[in-house]
């Protein structure tokens, strides 16, 4: 997972603040992460509120992402030992791709923002990456890399991470919402990555 896991923010909330709709979007995000409303529906509502936001704002947010303590060291160690890494996120490819370059991550699967004339349209391109899609991407990567799903590790914090966490050989709820902690086999709440 990316938001509130690999980075210490929910990017969509940051974008919403800059678009002047922060409180509205934050309330929808919280409900979705707690499993109170469907992720896909919440995603569409939040996207619509971002219409007109400048691509320049996206760049400024990307270069200032607060990367979780220990993430650089963890990714370097995983790479050294030959592990493949991925961002499977209900967030945005724009930021996932930035982190991929920054941290040397192998795969990124997230939602693609639709940008026209340098501004967000309030729409997205392709399928919404929800919990089920994250699990499907995890399985596809395992298949591509020739490993059994039991040899995978997934880390996440929100309700939309549960399908992926439950599919992985080791699923870790990281600084997770209460419902996620209750439903994940392993939970970490006090350390960095």
Report the location of each language-model feature.
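Active-site neighborhood of HAD-like aspartate-dependent phosphohydrolases
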Residues: 2-40, 44-45
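Charged/polar, solvent-exposed surface patches and flexible loops
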Residues: 14-17, 27-30, 45-48, 60-64, ...
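Cysteine/selenocysteine-centered motifs that mediate thiol-based redox chemistry or coordinate metal-sulfur cofactors
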Residues: 36-57, 61
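C-terminal cap/substrate-recognition subdomain and adjoining C-terminal extension
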Residues: 52-193
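A short acidic Gly-Thr/Ser loop motif
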Residues: 1-3, 157-158
């Amino acid at each position: 997972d990316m938001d509130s896991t690999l980075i210490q923010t929910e990017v969509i909330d940051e974008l919403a603040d800059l678009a002047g709709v922060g409180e509205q979007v934050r309330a929808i995000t919280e409900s979705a992460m707690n499993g109170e409303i469907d992720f896909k529906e919440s995603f569409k509502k939040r996207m619509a509120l971002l219409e007109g936001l400048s691509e320049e704002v996206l760049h400024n947010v990307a270069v200032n992402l607060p990367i979780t303590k220990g993430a650089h060291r963890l990714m370097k160690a995983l790479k050294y030992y030959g592990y493949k890494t991925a961002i499977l996120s209900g967030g945005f490819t724009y930021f996932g791709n930035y982190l991929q370059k920054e941290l040397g991550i192998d795969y990124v699967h997230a939602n693609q923002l639709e940008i026209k004339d340098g501004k967000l349209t309030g729409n997205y391109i392709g399928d919404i990456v929800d919990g089920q899609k994250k699990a499907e991407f995890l399985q596809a990567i395992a298949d591509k890399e020739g490993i059994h799903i039991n040899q995978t590790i997934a880390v996440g914090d929100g309700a939309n991470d549960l399908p992926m966490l439950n599919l992985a050989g080791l699923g870790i709820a990281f600084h997770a919402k209460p419902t996620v902690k209750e439903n994940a086999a392993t939970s970490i709440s006090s350390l960095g990555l």
